[in-house]
Amino acid sequence: KIKQRVNELHEFNPMLGFRGCRLGIVHGEISEMQARAVFEAAAEVQNGGTKVNPEVMIPLVGFKREFDLQVEIVHRVAQEVQAAKKVKLNYLVGTMIEVPRGALTADEIAETAEFFSFGTNDLTQTALGMSRDDSGSFLPHYAELEIVKRNPFATIDQNSVGKLMQIAI
């Protein structure tokens, strides 16, 4: 059964494939399990006398509805854990902007998101269509030919990723 599940989840392009919030939407039990782990740990620590403020970050959001569906799971699980552990947790739910569509529609996502973070590695890969892992085979040549002035994985390319970040802000 495990081998069958592994084969079902095999991806042809893991960078753009079945991961992040997409995986959590299709298999909500994964998001539920992760949220439960966060809130149970937070409840245990807080019931031990230390104030905590967990921040749950939903990855790879490109559509507001993706985010909203995941937020519903997070809030439901938070309520269940707080009731079971008799604790009140102050928590935030936000997203990491990692795909161009997420940056371009950040105003919509912000209607629900309580915070944003930028995943500049993934955002660079998706904006430029370059794999960081493969870039060593061509980036030195690109620099030599002055196609790129700097390694876009070492510094933010202001003409692409930088502009996407400005739009999102």
Language model feature labels by segment:
Residues 1-169:
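Conserved alpha/beta-domain cores
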